[in-house]
C-alpha cells in the first residue's frame, strides 16, 4: 500500500485548504471520461438546436445522444453551469417530479432561450468553462451517472452553490445528491471489480466469497434498500437479477447468526417492505414480487437451528445447509450478549409478514432467558453462554458486544406500536443504570462520556468509549419522543422534566461523538477514544453538567476540549462506521437544529477527502485517522453502503422519506414498518420476574419463572 498516494492531487500544498467533497468527487469522476474536448463543438451545436426547438413544448431535440455518451454528460454540465439549474438539458428525461424529493425533469426557459443574445451567452459560457476547468488541456468534468430515469446529470451541476455558508442558504438537495454520487462511485467500483463477492477490496480491486459458490450476497443484499431509497432502478435491477439467479443459501457453511440476521435477513425484509411502499420499485414481472420475502423465509428457516440450544439463547453461528447451531469458537464458547439479543426486530417482522408464530416465539424466548438473570440496574455483562443461558464474566459496556441489546429494547417497543411495554420498562431501567454507573464527564471541558466497567458495577470506571456507542444519543432522542418532532412531543401529557433532561443528555452525547471526529487530523473518528477524567471522576448521578466547549474553538496550551481526548495508536483506524451519522439523523429530525446536518456534512467531506481510492476503486476504510494521507486498509465495509451513506442521504433529504414515527431501523439501518401485532394475534408471551426495592429478583418468583420458562410460549 502506497501511503503517499495522491491520485487526484488532493494533498499538495495548495490543496490543504480542505477542498469540498463536491470537488473531490468531481476529480474522481474526471478520470472516467475522455471525450469532452472532442465534444465541445457538438455541444454548442446541440445547444443551438435545443434553442431552435424550444417552441415545441414536447419536442425532443434532434440528434439526442445516448445517456451513456460523454457528449450528453458534457452538454448537461454546460447547461447547468450557464443556467444555474442542477437539471440537465430540457426534454432529455421523462421522469416527472415525484414524492420523497426525487428530482424530476427540467423546466424550459423559452423566453431567454429564443433570443440570439441568450444563445450567444451560452456559447461563450461553454468556451469559458472549457478554459476555466482546464478541459483544453485534456481534463474532463463529466460527473457520475444517476439511475436510468435520471441520467445526464453531471456532478458539476450539483456543486454550484452547494457549499452554503453563514451568509448563504445551504442547498441540502445538492448535498444529498453528492452523497448519492459517492454511493454510485462505490457501487460502480464494486460492480466493475468485485461483483457478487462478499468482500470487496477497493485498492487491489479484488474480492472474496464467504462461501462457495457465488457467496452470500453480503454486499448486494445489504445495499438493496439503499438502492431503493436512492431510486437507483438500473442498479437495483442488476442486484435483483443476481439475487434471482445466483443467491442460494443451501451451503455447508457456518455463518455468524447475528451478522447474517441483521444484514441478510434484514436486508431482504426491508427490500420487500420498500418495494411495496416506495413508488416505481415493483418488478415488471408480477411473479417476482415476493422474491425477497421468499429468500428471507428460506434463510430464516436455516437460521432457526441456532435457537435450538438448551437455554433458547442462540448459538453464535449456524451451518446453513443443515441448520446446525455451533458455539462460539472464542470467548470460552460464550455468545455475545448483543448478538444474541439483536435478532428480534427481524424475526418479529418476518412473523408478522408470514403469520408464522415460530419466528416470534424463538426471538422473544431469548429476551426472557436473558432478563431472568436479573442483571443489576439493567446493565448486562457482554457475554452469555448459549447452553446455560447465564452470563460469562461481569464486564459491562454499551460498545462492542453490548450495544444493540439496549438499542433493540426500545425499538421492539416502538416496532409493535407500543403494544409491548415490557421493553420500554427494560429500556428505562438500563438507561437509568447507565446514568448511575457509567455516565461521567471529561476533566477540562465536561464533555459527557459513557464509560465502561470492565469488572462489573462495583469495579473501576474505564474512560473508554467505542464509536459504536454513538448510536446512543439518537436512540435516547427516539425513545424520549417516539420519533415525532420535539415541539410536538412537548405537547404530550407524558412530557415533563425527565424528558427534557433526557433530550439534553442526547445533545451532550452527540457533541462528544462529534468531538471524536473533530479532534483528529483527518476529521474522521477513530474506532475507540479514551478520555481524561477527574480523580475521582465526576458522575452524572451526582450532578448534571453542560459541556464548556462548542467544539469549534480550542484553548491554547492544551487546556481546551481537545486535551480531553486520547487516541491510542491501536484504536486509530476508521471502519466507515455509521453510528454517529445515525444519531445525527435522529437528532436533526427530532430537534430541527441545523447543526446536526452541518456536522454530518463535515463528516461526509472528510470521508470523501481521505478515503477515496484512485482509479475508480471507490472508498476504503483507513488505518490511522491522525495521519495525512491515512493508510488505506483496502476494504469497503458492506455497511458503508447499507448504513453510512444511507443515513447521510436521509440526513440531507426531506423528513417525509421514512418518517421516524412510522418505521424503525434495525441495527444495520434496514427500515421496517411499525405494525399492529394484535392483527396477527401476536403479543408478548412472557412476564418479567418481579424485582425488590433494590432491583434484585424476588427469590420465590425465580422458581416459578424457571418452571414456566421450560414450557412453549402460547401466542
PLM feature spans:
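Glycan-recognition and catalytic cores of secretory/periplasmic carbohydrate-active enzymes
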Residues: 2-31, 36, 43, 48-715
Amino acid at each position: 500500500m502506497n501511503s503517499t498516494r495522491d491520485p487526484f492531487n488532493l494533498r499538495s500544498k495548495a490543496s490543504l485548504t480542505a477542498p469540498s467533497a463536491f470537488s473531490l468527487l468531481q476529480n474522481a469522476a474526471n478520470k472516467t471520461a475522455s471525450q469532452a474536448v472532442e465534444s465541445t463543438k457538438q455541444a454548442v451545436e446541440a445547444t443551438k438546436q435545443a434553442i431552435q426547438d424550444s417552441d415545441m413544448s414536447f419536442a425532443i431535440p434532434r440528434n439526442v445522444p445516448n445517456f451513456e455518451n460523454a457528449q450528453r454528460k458534457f452538454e448537461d454540465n454546460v447547461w447547468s453551469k450557464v443556467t444555474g439549474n442542477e437539471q440537465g438539458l430540457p426534454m432529455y428525461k421523462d421522469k416527472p417530479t415525484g414524492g420523497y424529493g426525487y428530482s424530476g425533469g427540467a423546466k424550459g426557459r423559452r423566453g431567454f432561450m429564443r433570443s440570439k443574445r441568450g444563445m450567444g451567452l451560452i456559447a461563450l459560457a461553454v468556451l469559458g468553462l472549457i478554459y476555466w476547468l482546464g478541459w483544453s488541456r485534456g481534463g474532463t468534468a463529466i460527473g457520475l451517472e444517476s439511475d436510468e430515469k435520471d441520467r445526464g446529470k453531471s456532478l458539476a451541476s450539483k456543486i454550484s452553490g452547494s457549499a452554503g455558508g453563514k451568509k448563504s442558504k445551504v442547498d441540502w438537495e445538492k448535498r444529498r445528491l453528492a452523497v448519492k454520487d459517492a454511493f454510485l462511485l462505490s457501487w460502480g467500483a464494486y460492480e466493475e471489480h468485485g461483483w457478487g463477492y462478499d468482500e470487496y477490496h477497493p485498492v487491489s480491486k479484488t474480492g472474496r466469497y464467504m462461501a462457495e459458490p457465488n457467496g452470500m450476497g453480503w454486499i448486494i443484499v445489504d445495499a438493496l434498500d439503499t438502492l431503493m431509497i436512492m431510486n437507483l432502478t438500473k442498479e437495483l435491477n442488476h442486484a435483483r437479477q443476481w439475487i434471482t439467479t445466483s443467491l442460494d443459501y443451501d451451503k455447508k457453511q457456518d455463518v455468524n447468526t447475528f451478522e447474517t440476521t441483521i444484514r441478510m435477513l434484514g436486508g431482504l425484509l426491508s427490500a420487500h417492505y420498500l418495494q411495496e411502499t416506495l413508488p416505481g420499485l415493483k418488478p415488471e414481472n408480477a411473479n417476482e414480487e415476493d422474491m425477497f420475502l421468499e429468500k428471507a423465509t428460506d434463510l430464516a428457516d436455516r437460521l432457526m437451528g441456532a435457537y435450538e440450544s438448551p437455554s433458547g439463547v442462540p448459538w453464535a453461528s449456524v451451518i446453513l445447509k443443515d441448520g446446525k447451531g455451533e458455539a462460539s469458537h472464542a470467548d470460552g464458547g460464550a455468545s455475545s450478549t448483543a448478538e444474541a439479543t439483536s435478532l428480534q426486530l427481524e424475526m418479529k417482522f418476518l412473523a408478522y409478514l408470514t403469520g408464522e408464530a415460530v419466528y416470534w416465539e424463538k426471538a422473544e424466548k431469548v429476551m426472557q432467558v436473558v432478563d431472568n438473570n436479573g442483571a443489576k440496574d439493567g446493565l448486562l455483562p457482554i457475554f452469555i453462554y448459549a447452553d446455560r443461558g447465564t452470563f460469562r464474566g461481569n464486564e459491562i459496556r454499551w460498545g462492542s458486544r453490548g450495544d444493540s441489546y439496549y438499542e433493540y429494547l426500545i425499538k421492539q417497543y416502538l416496532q409493535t406500536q407500543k403494544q409491548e411495554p415490557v421493553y420500554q420498562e427494560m429500556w428505562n431501567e438500563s438507561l437509568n443504570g447507565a446514568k448511575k454507573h457509567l455516565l461521567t464527564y471529561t476533566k477540562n471541558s465536561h464533555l459527557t462520556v459513557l464509560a465502561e466497567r470492565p469488572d462489573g458495577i462495583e469495579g473501576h470506571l474505564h474512560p473508554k468509549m467505542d464509536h459504536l456507542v454513538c448510536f446512543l444519543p439518537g436512540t435516547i432522542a427516539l425513545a424520549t419522543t417516539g420519533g415525532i418532532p420535539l415541539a410536538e412531543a412537548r405537547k404530550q401529557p407524558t412530557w415533563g422534566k425527565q424528558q427534557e433532561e433526557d433530550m439534553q443528555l442526547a445533545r451532550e452525547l452527540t457533541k462528544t461523538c462529534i468531538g471524536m471526529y473533530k479532534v483528529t487530523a483527518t476529521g474522521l473518528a477513530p474506532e475507540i477514544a479514551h478520555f481524561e477524567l477527574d480523580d475521582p471522576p465526576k458522575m452524572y448521578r451526582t450532578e448534571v453538567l453542560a459541556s464548556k466547549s462548542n467544539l469549534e474553538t480550542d484553548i491554547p496550551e492544551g487546556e481546551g476540549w481537545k486535551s480531553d481526548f486520547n487516541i491510542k495508536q491501536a484504536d486509530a483506524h476508521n471502519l466507515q462506521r455509521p453510528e454517529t451519522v445515525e444519531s445525527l439523523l435522529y437528532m436533526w429530525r427530532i430537534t430541527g437544529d441545523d447543526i446536526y446536518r452541518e456536522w454530518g456534512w463535515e463528516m461526509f467531506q472528510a470521508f470523501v477527502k481521505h478515503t477515496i481510492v484512485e482509479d475508480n476503486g471507490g472508498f476504503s476504510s483507513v488505518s490511522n485517522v491522525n495521519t495525512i494521507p491515512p493508510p488505506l486498509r483496502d476494504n469497503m465495509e458492506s455497511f458503508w453502503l447499507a448504513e453510512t451513506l444511507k443515513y447521510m442521504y436521509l440526513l440531507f433529504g426531506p423528513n417525509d422519506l421514512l418518517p421516524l414515527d412510522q418505521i424503525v431501523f434495525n441495527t444495520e439501518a434496514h427500515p421496517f414498518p411499525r405494525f399492529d401485532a394484535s392483527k396477527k394475534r401476536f403479543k408478548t408471551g412472557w412476564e418479567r420476574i418481579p424485582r425488590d426495592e433494590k432491583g434484585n429478583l424476588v427469590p420465590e418468583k425465580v422458581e416459578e419463572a424457571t418452571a414456566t420458562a421450560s414450557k412453549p410460549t402460547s401466542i
